């Protein structure tokens, strides 16, 4: 009986490493990579040979080589977002690194993109169908809190247009509006809160009207 094919790796389970040395393949199945290259490991079902991708090429790598001769990158998407490194971010997403993964602070890559003012990164993350806008980190801050606090009105506008919530409070009970450090951010947030408030009021009135008509 032939061995069943390995299960596909779920997004977010991809392991990412930076090669410390160049690896010269001995067979056509093996993956060539150079010192400093980023390697995405997608299949670790075989304990001896792992399947990986590097610079768009896929092949096998001895697992002991990766363990001993490569440096693990725990949150590559976060690192790319923090640095504003668009090409690396795209590469991570292409290699199925999970878009909503959390770092030790409980923050997403989107949070760090907003914190750093990297609008182009935010726009690419928004192309991911399941991107989580309202994830709160260990301090209770969302991506909207970060953008407002750092004063990036263009990013605040992007987040609001995408549907980010303005009513979430952090651990200090502060809304994104309370964190806004400039008038442009505050104005956008006030306007959105007023719109949301009016919509909530309208929904409540509709509900009461429906009850009256029963």
Swiss-Prot record:
Sequence ranges assigned to domain SH3 in this UniProt record: 12-71
Acetylation recorded as keyword: yes
A Pfam short name: SH3_1
SUPFAM superfamilies: Ankyrin repeat (SSF48403), SH3-domain (SSF50044)
ANK repeat placement: 72-101, 105-135, 139-168
PTM annotation (N-acetylserine): residues: 2
Phosphothreonine found at: 200
GO biological process: signal transduction
Residue numbers carrying Phosphoserine: 202, 213
Example of a GO MF term: SH3 domain binding
Keywords associated with the record: Acetylation, ANK repeat, Cytoplasm, Phosphoprotein, Repeat, SH3 domain
Protein's cellular compartments: Cytoplasm
Annotated Gene Ontology cellular component terms: cytoplasm
Domain notes for this protein: The SH3 domain mediates interaction with SMN1.
Function: Induces bone resorption, acting probably through a signaling cascade which results in the secretion of factor(s) enhancing osteoclast formation and activity.
Self-association state and partner proteins as the record states: Interacts with SRC and SMN1. Interacts with FASLG.
Name under which the protein is recorded: Osteoclast-stimulating factor 1
Higher taxonomy: Eukaryota, Metazoa, Chordata, Craniata, Vertebrata
